[in-house]
Amino acid sequence: MLRKLILITVATVFFACQLLVNPVSALELDEESRTVQYNEQGDEVVISIKEAERGKRLFNDTCAQCHLGGVTKTNPNVGLSLEALERAEPPRDNIAGLIDYMKNPTTYDGEIDIKEIHPNTVRSDILPERRNLTDDDLEAIAAHILSQPKSPRKQWGDGKVYN
């Protein structure tokens, strides 16, 4: 009887773990989902599956502490949804805009420099993980952020964005 109980418990745990483990979401993105705006002029790029996976890994390592799921923990009013990024000043709904923001962060309205309090590549003492990020790394992170709202599996950045 005890042996049956142990076997059932092990089987239950095994199958429960299978349900909890998600497949790699970058692989689920089709070409349309991987097409993101590159600059304010509207040029677009299609990121490869490999770039999408790299961007996801870098985002999880350096940004997800505060932006898990595209929500901003320190200010839930402003997330990383395309709508919120588009309304920022200057707009951050493109790769070039996000790279500029990651290097030189400003408030949502673009009025105040927040390098002293927001992680960036200039002041890596705030978040040491950003110390060695290259422009290619920042581009991969930006592409990941911009492709996530197009993912059919999950919501991204659905914080409180006021009209």
From Swiss-Prot:
Tell me the cofactor note.
Binds 1 heme c group covalently per subunit.
Compartments in which it is found: Cellular thylakoid membrane
Identify the keywords attached in UniProt to this record, alphabetized: Electron transport, Heme, Iron, Membrane, Metal-binding, Photosynthesis, Photosystem II, Signal, Thylakoid, Transport
List, alphabetically, the InterPro entries matched: Cyt_c-like_dom, Cyt_c-like_dom_sf, Cytochrom_C550, PsbV_cyt_c550, PsbV_cyt_c550-like
Function, in words: One of the extrinsic, lumenal subunits of photosystem II (PSII). PSII is a light-driven water plastoquinone oxidoreductase, using light energy to abstract electrons from H(2)O, generating a proton gradient subsequently used for ATP formation. The extrinsic proteins stabilize the structure of photosystem II oxygen-evolving complex (OEC), the ion environment of oxygen evolution and protect the OEC against heat-induced inactivation. Low-potential cytochrome c that plays a role in the OEC of PSII.
Q: Which NCBIfam families match?
A: PS_II_C550 (TIGR03045)
User: Any idea what this protein is called?
Assistant: Photosystem II extrinsic protein V
Species name:
Aphanothece halophytica
The gene name on file is psbV
